[in-house]
């Protein structure tokens, strides 16, 4: 429907730009970059960056609308989101690569995306944050205990203990 048409006509939304990033072991990681609305390639100001990690882990990101990504971009952040190993949509090998091994292949891919962000001309490499919910929160927790490259971190409804998750989960 076009229920929100009048509202959307008043807003300038960020459009995700598709990227492919090569992980250290040669795996290609599908990613998207959303710059603040109105920012052009001629803009010299470097913005804070936010690396978003999806839940699941067997979920996936794409070019669909994410309210929280638009809010962050509108606030002046460059938002980067990707589908590291463990994500759906790239075949069985990609999806099952982290089975019983969270924090290995997926972590390699997350680090590759972070390295991409540190080199991106629109992103201030000293102001990169990481965030995610559920499994994305787990990987955010993993990241901040395995590197100091992130200036900030937000975990939302995160998995912090796999044993307690098994005993208290709705699944």
PLM segments and residue spans:
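Non-catalytic accessory segments flanking enzyme active sites
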Residues: 1-42, 67-70, 74-75, 116-119, ...
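Short beta-alpha junctions and helix-cap segments that line functional grooves
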Residues: 4, 62-68, 139-141
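Short, conserved glycine- and acidic-residue-centered signature motifs
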Residues: 14, 65, 103-106
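Proline-rich low-complexity regions
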Residues: 14-16, 36, 48, 57, ...
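Alpha/beta-hydrolase fold active-site loops
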Residues: 29, 48, 127
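Short hydrophobic segments within beta-strands
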Residues: 34, 52-53, 131
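Short substrate-entry loop that stabilizes the transition state in hydrolases
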Residues: 39-91, 162
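Active-site-proximal cap/loop segments of hydrolase catalytic domains
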Residues: 81-171
């Amino acid at each position: 429907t076009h229920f929100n048409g009048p509202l959307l006509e008043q807003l300038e939304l960020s459009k995700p730009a598709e990227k492919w990033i090569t992980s250290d072991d040669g795996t290609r990681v599908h990613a998207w970059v959303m710059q603040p609305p109105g920012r052009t390639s001629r803009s010299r100001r470097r913005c804070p960056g936010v690396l978003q990690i999806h839940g699941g882990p067997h979920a996936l990101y794409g070019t669909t609308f994410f309210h929280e990504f638009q809010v962050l971009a509108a606030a002046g952040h460059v938002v980067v989101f990707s589908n590291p190993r463990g994500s759906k949509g790239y075949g069985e090998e990609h999806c099952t690569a982290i089975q019983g091994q969270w924090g290995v292949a997926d972590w390699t891919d997350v680090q590759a995306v972070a390295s991409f962000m540190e080199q991106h001309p629109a992103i201030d490499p000293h102001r990169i944050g990481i965030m995610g919910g559920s499994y994305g929160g787990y990987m955010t927790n993993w990241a901040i205990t395995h590197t100091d490259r992130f200036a900030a971190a937000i975990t939302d409804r995160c998995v912090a203990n796999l044993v307690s998750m098994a005993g208290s989960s709705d699944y």
